[in-house]
Swiss-Prot record:
Name assigned to this protein: ATP-dependent helicase/deoxyribonuclease subunit B
Cofactor(s) the protein requires to work: Mg(2+)
Keyword terms, alphabetized: ATP-binding, DNA damage, DNA repair, DNA-binding, Exonuclease, Helicase, Hydrolase, Nuclease, Nucleotide-binding
Remaining remarks: Despite having helicase-like domains, this subunit does not have helicase activity.
Quaternary structure and partners: Heterodimer of AddA and RexB.
Recorded superkingdom: Bacteria
Chain's role: The heterodimer acts as both an ATP-dependent DNA helicase and an ATP-dependent, dual-direction single-stranded exonuclease. Recognizes the chi site generating a DNA molecule suitable for the initiation of homologous recombination. This subunit has 5' -> 3' nuclease activity but not helicase activity.
HAMAP family to which the protein is assigned, alphabetical: AddB_type2
PANTHER family: RECBCD ENZYME SUBUNIT RECC
Gene3D superfamilies xrefs: 3.90.320.10, P-loop containing nucleotide triphosphate hydrolases
Enzyme Commission number, as recorded: 3.1.-.-
Length: 1071
């Protein structure tokens, strides 16, 4: 054993490479060992330092792969044991145990987190070279008994299934101990670089290598000043000193100091000395020199996105100066927080990168497909799960448009559950869904799923065969190939597919002869897929490397950017969570020699010092350390290590916001510039932050409130939301010349409510999602149908019998059967509707002097060449004197208000009067009115009645009255019926005024509509609040900001309101 240490200003790799070259020149085979996370980079660095740039005598590798380079005569290789396979083995072991067999863990047998913790514990035991029987001194002795039962049973299964229980290091160590490699190892030299500690497994292997190899050489960074210290607690070199001291004591050798030819910039050395002095309680009488500051930068940004963009711009600047991507390293303080953001931003700046972290498979479409398949079986064909399977792109041969159409129909018809999916689709709507096509698609989906899901409990091998057959039927493999759109995606899909097939193979091997339910089979495969990871090697070496900052080594790259160095992440506080606590691990370590658990929390301090030291020396030319004030949407403080650097004299530069400019850093990259052109042109709109905008918005609201109290008015802002006019070509297509524009009373109301709403509904023909579940529209259709049947029945049957017959026959109609007999909720709605019919029907029985002339009457009202008004009149009544009137059924309370009508928001009754006047060749004297009938079940507050008598009945019938517009000429005939004529009587001249103004409203609307310019102008009655449809999700209308765009209604005092509005109508309609 040879131990070497050196100062941070020298290159330990160069020193060790020289030792390796000497051994290789003497004919020895040299293994250059690096940590798992650094072997790829260390290999490139070692080969760069060799004069010949490559050699077969020096092999750069890891401890775990070292055994591959030795020839050992052994028995046939056993099955490989990975984490997913281990989890399946533990699941099978727990299946064979009863809850009462495990007093401590019996309730967690099927818990996936518990199984993951068992896998981690098993791996820890292997690394620590401990067995489950060594777990003494636990807080609860029952825990050890349970763990012994579980792990021993799992190991029995491993033996039965011919799995290799030993790790590669254990197998290698056993071969060395048996003397199988003595001849080969005697000609071997092992060089170890980059370690500051060994696991128990590595420590044991190292002792064997030291006894059998020609030489073992280990190096570490320690300053001469620190090496001579007797008290090292808190020293920045504490981890390395303990590492060297333990090896020196164990192998009875003294470490030697060495230097390299390569000496790094003095600025980094001086910073290291200041950092060391701060932590070893010594003092220095000098500070950093001015030119030292050129090699360090401390940045502070507002949030992560700005921080990454500043880094990207700086990288582009480095490329402009002649450097390569491979000269740059980006370190992340929090991988999870930055991983999703850094990729898109680097892509925008066209910076190729390699993220040194295995990617989880959880977001891949194949995993989403398997998860949806499992949930479809578990939750009995839930619609969302079936659709997610289709949307993954891996099920069958369906276009996106087909899937969208299928989704729209299943939502409309509320298709969910196996029963509904297995039956042909028969329900249709006004949109006329293509049922033949949808049923063909349904069969293509249901048949393979049904064949798979009907599988009963059987052997695991049989279940896998059926699953593979199902995957072939839906063309999973072919669809998987079609997902990739780039070479990188092809490589990712290949890695995911390989993991998927490995999981199926492991399941077949472990559970092949075990009886399982399909749900358990799919759940195990899903769990394995979601927890699996894959890694893709970059296609070129000239990329920016990105990795976690705690994996960095000194002198890694010329330029290093370390971002996200907040107090919460730098230093990192690691706390182990698992089946064993750190206290239990410590007690076990005390009684075991050369076998021990790794306790991360016990080494936080010295490991963090070592990481900070490596980070501060990671660059050879320039180091940038950055911290955001907001990370993961929470405020965080500066790292204590960065505060030390500030005390050393390094300035903290506030990078501020990423204001767009015409500097080289902003316009030097075409793709980044292209993505920011719009923002540059709108720079005046982003001068305030979101926080500033929110502040001034709240202030504006408060100011307006105070001004209203003082009866002052604040000038409203200019129009913020604007719309474009339709092109002439579109106008000609939508509103062709010579063809009248079709309008209804409802469409006219929508136009005067908000013009943009009319544009969406009647020009673009956008509709809300339909549903078979009864809503107010279907409830209205039901009530209309019952009363239509009732009023058509002219038999001599008692009224109650006719009412029962009308309800019965309406309920028997196929449409209403489908709607109201689908579930208990629909049946309850039907019962309420029947109560409403029974409560409202007596009003028809009371008015025996009324004769129903027609029902559900279609009309087309001609108002000139420009417009054709259409609609349906619910009922036309005739009084005893022959006068006609219109009845409109309503499921909610309605009454005619002349002010609302004047503003265009209630044209329905007057439009019906105009239609009736055109349908029947009568003059205005023979129209008695137009009215609403509120179909309701009246609710009365019995507390207001002293006793139950006729007043109670009168109150009920008082609520059931016709309300609307009535002719003053027919006053006497109306007095005997259930008509509310108070404040609702109009003379013939006044009725003519209403009819003429109604025509004016239509013509005015048509003139504006044909111009093709629709405003965002929901109406407001008071200028303070907006009552019209704002359509916020589409228009982004805000009442506080856009009140100037709202249409102000004309309102008049209640006194003489009718006369005043009629006067206005005459003026505007030119009467």
């Amino acid at each position: 054993m040879k131990l070497i240490y050196t100062e941070m200003s020298y290159s330990m790799t160069e020193i060790l490479v020289n030792e390796a070259r000497k051994a290789a020149d003497q004919g020895y085979r040299v293994f250059y060992i690096a940590p798992n996370s650094l072997s790829f980079e260390k290999e490139r660095e070692v080969l760069t330092l060799l004069p010949e740039r490559g050699t077969f005598s020096i092999i750069v590798t890891r401890f775990v792969q070292m055994s591959r380079y030795f020839t050992v005569e052994s028995s046939p290789s056993k099955q490989h044991l990975d984490d997913t396979t281990l989890a399946m083995i533990f699941y099978r072991a727990l299946m064979q145990l009863k809850p009462e067999d495990l007093p401590s863990y019996g309730r967690l047998q099927n818990n996936s987190v518990f199984i993951e913790q068992l896998v981690e514990l098993y791996k820890e035991l292997k690394n620590a070279q401990l067995s489950v029987h060594d777990l003494t001194g636990l807080d609860h002795p029952q825990k050890q008994e349970d763990l012994i039962k579980i792990i021993e049973l799992a190991e029995t299964i491993m033996i039965q299934q011919d799995y290799n229980q030993d790790s590669p290091l254990q197998s290698f160590a056993r071969a060395i101990k048996l003397g199988l490699l003595n001849n080969q190892l005697s000609k071997t030299v092992v060089v170890i670089d980059g370690f500051s500690r060994f696991s128990a497994e590595e420590d044991y292997l190292l002792s064997l290598l030291n006894n059998n190899c020609q030489e073992v050489i280990t190096g570490s960074y320690v300053s001469q000043k620190a090496y001579q210290k007797s008290f090292i607690k808190g020293n920045i070199y504490e981890a390395s000193l303990h590492f060297l001291q333990d090896l020196a004591q164990k192998y009875h050798i003294k470490p030697v100091f060495a230097t390299s030819n390569q000496v790094f910039k003095p600025a980094f050395s001086r910073l290291t000395q200041l950092f060391e002095a701060t932590h070893d309680f010594s003092q220095v009488d000098w500070q950093l020199q001015k030119n030292d500051l050129d090699h360090f930068s401390l940045w502070q940004c507002h949030h992560q996105k700005e921080e990454i963009e500043h880094v990207a711009k700086s990288i582009r600047q480095k490329l402009y100066e002649g450097y390569r991507y491979k000269d740059i390293l980006v370190l992340l303080g929090d991988m999870d927080a930055y991983q999703l953001q850094i990729g898109p931003i680097f892509d925008k700046f066209e910076i190729p990168y390699y993220l040194g972290k295995a990617e989880p498979m959880a977001a891949h479409p194949l995993v989403q497909f398997i998860e949806s398949l499992e949930r479809s079986q578990r939750y009995n064909w839930r619609r969302e799960d079936i659709l997610n399977m289709l949307k993954s792109g891996l099920f069958g041969c369906f276009d996106d448009s087909d899937i969208d159409r299928f989704e729209e129909y299943t939502q409309f018809a509320d298709i969910k559950g196996f029963t509904k999916f297995s039956k042909p689709f028969t329900i249709n709507s006004s949109r006329q869904y293509p049922l033949d096509f949808l049923n063909e698609m349904r069969q293509d989906i249901v048949l393979p799923l049904q064949e798979l899901f009907k599988s009963q409990k059987q052997l695991g091998a049989s279940l896998v065969d059926k699953l593979i057959l199902f995957l072939k039927k839906i063309r999973l493999a072919e669809n998987m190939q079609g997902l990739a759109q780039s070479q990188l995606e092809v490589e990712k899909n290949e890695e995911v597919w390989k993991r998927f097939t490995d999981i199926l193979t492991s399941f077949h091997h472990i559970f092949g002869q075990e009886k399982l339910r399909l749900s358990d089979c799919l759940a195990l495969i899903k769990t394995g897929m979601k927890s699996a990871q894959y890694r893709v090697v970059p296609a070129t070496l000239d990329v920016v490397t990105i990795k976690s900052y705690d994996l960095v080594q000194p002198h890694s790259k010329p330029f290093v950017y370390a971002i996200g160095l907040t107090q919460s992440h730098f230093p990192k506080q690691i706390h182990h969570s698992g089946l064993l606590s750190d206290q239990e691990r410590a007690r076990i370590n005390e009684i075991r020699n050369y076998r021990h658990f790794d306790i991360a929390s016990a080494e936080n301090s010295k490991k963090n010092h070592q990481t900070a030291l490596s980070l501060f020396n990671a660059a050879t030319k320039e180091l940038v350390l950055s911290v955001p004030t907001v990370i993961n949407e929470t405020f965080d403080d500066l790292s204590p290590y960065l505060k030390e650097l500030i005390n050393f004299g390094l300035p903290l530069l506030d990078k501020g916001k990423n204001y767009l400019s015409y500097d080289n850093s902003d316009i030097g990259n075409y793709k980044a510039l292209l993505s920011q052109i719009i923002a540059i042109n709108r720079q005046d709109l982003i001068e305030m932050s979101d926080q500033d905008k929110m502040f001034w918005t709240v202030v504006l609201r408060y100011l307006r409130k105070q001004l209203r109290k003082q009866q002052l008015e604040l000038p409203t802002s200019d129009y913020r939301l604007s719309t474009k006019s339709l092109s002439k070509e579109v106008i000609e297509v939508c509103f062709p010349k010579g063809i009248p524009l079709k309008l209804s009373a409802t469409a006219l109301t929508v136009f005067y409510n908000n013009q943009y709403n009319y544009f969406l509904k009647y020009v673009l023909n956008l509709n809300k999602t339909e549903s078979i579940h009864p809503d107010s529209r279907i409830h209205g259709q039901y009530l209309h149908r019952v009363f239509e049947r009732l009023m058509k029945d002219h038999t001599q049957e008692p009224f109650d019998n006719k009412l029962k017959q009308a309800i019965y026959h309406t309920n028997q109609e196929s449409f209403f059967q489908q709607v109201y007999q689908d579930n208990a909720e629909a049946e309850y709605s039907l019962a309420i509707l029947e109560d409403i019919v029974r409560s409202t029907a007596p009003i028809l029985q009371l008015n025996q002097n009324i004769k129903v002339i027609d029902q559900e009457k279609n009309f087309h009202l001609d108002m000139g060449n420009e417009i054709l008004v259409h609609g349906i009149i619910d009922r036309i009544d005739q009084l005893s004197d022959g006068s006609l009137g219109v009845v409109d059924y309503k499921s909610s309370a309605n009454q005619f208000d002349i002010g609302t009508f004047y503003n265009g928001l209630s044209p329905q009754l007057v439009t019906y009067l105009a239609a009736l006047k055109q349908i029947a060749p009568h003059d205005i004297n023979q129209l008695f009115g137009a009215m609403y009938l509120h179909l309701q079940d009246p609710k009365l507050d019995l507390v207001t009645f002293k006793q139950i008598d006729n007043t109670l009945v009168e109150s009920i019938y008082k609520a059931l009255t016709y309300k609307g517009i009535f002719s003053e000429v027919e006053k006497e005939h109306l007095s005997t019926g259930a008509y509310q004529t108070k404040n609702a009587l109009y003379s013939n001249d006044e009725l003519e005024t209403l009819l003429n103004y109604n025509k004016y409203l239509y013509l005015k609307a048509v003139k504006h509509i044909k111009k093709g310019h629709f405003l965002i102008n929901p109406y407001t009655s008071d200028g303070k609040t907006v009552q019209g449809d704002q359509l916020k999700a589409i228009t982004r209308f805000e009442a506080d900001l856009d009140m100037a765009q709202a249409r102000r209604l004309v309102t008049l005092p209640a006194k003489e309101k009718k006369e005043c509005f009629l006067t206005l109508m005459r003026k505007e309609s030119h009467l």
